Regions:
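Internal alpha-helical scaffold of NAD(P)-dependent oxidoreductase catalytic cores
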Residues: 1-35, 41-80, 117
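Interdomain hinge/lid region at the active-site interface
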Residues: 33, 83-144
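Generic detector of well-ordered alpha-helical packing
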Residues: 40-41, 53, 107, 144
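Short acidic/histidine-centered micro-motifs embedded in hydrophobic/aromatic stretches
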Residues: 56, 70-74, 126-133, 150
Length: 155
């Protein structure tokens, strides 16, 4: 990620190529740092969610290694940007592959299971609140990725 004048970045391409696998121009000066912080924000939240989820799996009696192996090939492990966002909300397609109402139902059941095993569910509770808030403004039948649209319109 590089911020600044595109011509300046191109003039340094050999340097960037030597230290990075991929160079993406992200905007004017300062955009590189902002992008780095936003990227690390998501990475650390994903790390915390992964830890909470694998702890949940362990508490309900699942094998952590088997669960992690399975999840690494599903939307849970591959991430929304690699699976759903590009074909759904970022393509302006909010037709439901997995509607918000179903996300709430599954979160309700998972949170109930977590509660019965005294498992941490901080991120589950936060996610449910976000989906419920979106449902309350009439977005329940839209694809679960529509929470991005909800957040963009809510600010």
């Amino acid at each position: 990620m590089a911020g600044g004048d595109l011509a300046d970045i191109e003039s340094l391409r050999n340097v960037f190529d030597a230290i990075a696998n991929k160079i993406v121009h992200v905007g004017p000066v300062g955009s590189g740092l902002k992008t780095k912080l936003v990227n690390n924000y998501m990475a650390m939240i994903n790390n915390a969610v992964t830890a909470e989820t694998l702890s949940f799996a362990h508490r309900v009696g699942l094998d952590i290694d088997a669960t992690a192996e399975l999840m690494s090939s599903t939307t849970a492990g591959l991430g929304q940007l690699n699976t759903n966002y590009t074909k759904k909300v970022l393509a302006n397609d909010l037709s439901p592959d997995f509607p918000i109402t179903m996300a709430i139902k599954d979160l309700d059941m998972a949170i109930e299971l977590a509660n019965s095993f005294d498992s941490e569910r901080l991120f589950g509770d936060l996610a449910k609140k976000l989906f419920v808030d979106a449902e309350e403004v009439g977005m329940g039948k839209l694809d679960q990725t529509a929470i991005l649209t909800y957040l963009l319109n809510d600010q």
